[in-house]
Structures are given as structure tokens and as C-alpha cells.
């Protein structure tokens, strides 16, 4: 992926991921991790319907630092500030759509949504809709020929202080997680992970290798096949919690696939070493 870190250590990567999970509330951290792991799993599992995660938190909730470090599962350069994709700061909707197409089966971090930048909430909701509906629009090139639109398979991970809520259908495509504010307090656990972020790609590589190993196809298929059953269970729970909830089935599908992606990850030995001791927090 984005650059290489020679000598990445799986053991150090596991230590770093353990710190990341514990740097924020483990239940929140594991939900984000499951989405990042689901991105390359999605097509292997035969699932349809991607979703985004929006991490809401005040300045000082460490949401960006956490996400950048976790993204290092797919390459150490995701920790570099210059590569951070910021909403409204040089990243137009068209530019982000182009990057989403290039991200293929990976997560895409879009940082720092603010309602008063980059076209505001309306543009942001349209962007979410376009990314998760699966592609760019067909356009004509300079020769008036139809240019082939690129399909999109990435999973957007977004951060911001305010959640855009202009469109119920688009919001239903996004799991919103509120990160607790950490008012100026040094987070030594997160710092421990950041100092070892260049090793995290060893875990990402182990995950990709495990997914590509045909010996694991059976367990992936077995867990993936529980999607509809888990979606119905989540829908029942959601409608019981909030009667008449709009788009309950869509939200339930997001929760079900996140849950099952985590269950698949527990079968990957490199990840299981980190995840099994904290698995009860992912609910």
C-alpha cells in the first residue's frame, strides 16, 4: 500500500493495536477497527451494501490521531499529516470521489467535516450517498465521448464535530460514534501506538494474506451467511428501542455486517491474539 516500512514486526504491531483499542473506549475502537477490516473482506464474503462510520467529537477527542494511526494497518504513510484528506481544505467533492475510486477495497479517511466549509452539509451528504451507492457519474470527455465511470468499493471513515443530518437515507448509511472529549490530557496509550504505527502494516498484511488463503474460505462463508439473520435481530432490537425508526433495516444491516466482520477477524490468528481478550467489548 502507501509506502513500505522495512522490518515491520508482527509482535510490535499487535502491541500497537492493543494500545489503540484501549486508547479510546474499547467498544468504540473495535467498531471502527471492524469496519477497516471489513473493507477488503466485503467482496470475499459476498456481501452487498457498504456503510460509513462518522466519528463525532470535540477538538481534543483525539479522533483524527486515532483514525490516522489505525489506518496504518494499510500502510505507514497514513500517519503523515500531509496525506490527510480534509473536508473543504483543497478536497473538493469531485477530488474525493476520484480518490474513493482509487481506494478500491480499502477504507477512505475523510477528516474534519464542518458544516460551514466545502459546500456544507448538503454537499457532504451527497458525497456520502455517491460513495456508498457505488460510483461516479458517467461524463463526456473532451472529444464528446462517454467516459467510463469508475466503480467505488471503499468504506468511508469520517470525522467531525457536527454530524450532517439533512437526509435520513444517507444518515442511515452511516454509523455515528461519539468519541469522549479528553481535555488536554496526554493519552499515553495512544502515544504508545503512534510510536509503533510503522509496524501496523504487518497486521494488515497478515489479514489480507489470511483472506486470500483458500483454506479459510469455509469459515468466511459460514459467518458471512449469517448476515440476514443478524440483520433481522438488530432490526428487532432497534425498533424496540425506538418505535417507528426510519430506515431501521438499513441501520441493522450496517450493524450486522460490522458484527460479523469482527467475528471473521477473530479467526485470523494474527488478529485473534489482540482481539480475543477484548472481544466482549464489541457489541
Please describe what each predicted stretch is:
Residues 150-152, 167-272:
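Phosphate-sensing "switch" segment of ASCE/P-loop ATPases
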Residues 1, 34, 83-97, 137-142, ...:
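Ser/Thr/Asn(+Pro)-rich, low-complexity disordered segments
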Residues 109-111, 138, 151-161, 176-178:
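Structural recognition of the conserved hydrophobic beta-strand(s) that form the central parallel beta-sheet
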Residues 107-131, 161-172:
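Conserved AAA+/SF3 P-loop NTPase catalytic/coupling segment centered on the Walker-B
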Residues 124-141, 146:
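Conserved catalytic/switch belt of AAA+ P-loop NTPases
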Residues 65-121:
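AAA+/P-loop NTPase substrate/partner-engagement loops
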Residues 1-83, 255:
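P-loop NTPase catalytic core of nucleic-acid-dependent motor ATPases
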Residues 50-54, 107, 155:
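Residue-level preference for the first positions of well-ordered beta-strands
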Amino acid at each position: 500500500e502507501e509506502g513500505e516500512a522495512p522490518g515491520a514486526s508482527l509482535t510490535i504491531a499487535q502491541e500497537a493495536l492493543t494500545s489503540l483499542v484501549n486508547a479510546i473506549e474499547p467498544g468504540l475502537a473495535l467498531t471502527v477497527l471492524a469496519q477497516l477490516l471489513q473493507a477488503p473482506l466485503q467482496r470475499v464474503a459476498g456481501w452487498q451494501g457498504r456503510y460509513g462510520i462518522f466519528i463525532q467529537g470535540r477538538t481534543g477527542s483525539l479522533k483524527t490521531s486515532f483514525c490516522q494511526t489505525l489506518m496504518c494497518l494499510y500502510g505507514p504513510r497514513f500517519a503523515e499529516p500531509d496525506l490527510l484528506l480534509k473536508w473543504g481544505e483543497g478536497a473538493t467533492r469531485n477530488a474525493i470521489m476520484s480518490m474513493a475510486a482509487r481506494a478500491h477495497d480499502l477504507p477512505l479517511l475523510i477528516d474534519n467535516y464542518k458544516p460551514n466549509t466545502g459546500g456544507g452539509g448538503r454537499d457532504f451528504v451527497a458525497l456520502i450517498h455517491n460513495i456508498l451507492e457505488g460510483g461516479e457519474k458517467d461524463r463526456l470527455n473532451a472529444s464528446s465521448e462517454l467516459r467510463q465511470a469508475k466503480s467505488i468499493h471503499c468504506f468511508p471513515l469520517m470525522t467531525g464535530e457536527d454530524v450532517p443530518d439533512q437526509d435520513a437515507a444517507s444518515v442511515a448509511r452511516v454509523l455515528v460514534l461519539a468519541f469522549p472529549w479528553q481535555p488536554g490530557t496526554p493519552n499515553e496509550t495512544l502515544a504508545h501506538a503512534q510510536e509503533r504505527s510503522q509496524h501496523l502494516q504487518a497486521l494488515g498484511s497478515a489479514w489480507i494474506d489470511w483472506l486470500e488463503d483458500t483454506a479459510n474460505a469455509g469459515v468466511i462463508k459460514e459467518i458471512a451467511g449469517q448476515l440476514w439473520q443478524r440483520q433481522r435481530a438488530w432490526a428487532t432490537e432497534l425498533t424496540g428501542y425506538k418505535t417507528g425508526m426510519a430506515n431501521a433495516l438499513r441501520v441493522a444491516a450496517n450493524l450486522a455486517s460490522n458484527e460479523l466482520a469482527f467475528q471473521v477477524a477473530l479467526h485470523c490468528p494474527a488478529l485473534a491474539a489482540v482481539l480475543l481478550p477484548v472481544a466482549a467489548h464489541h457489541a
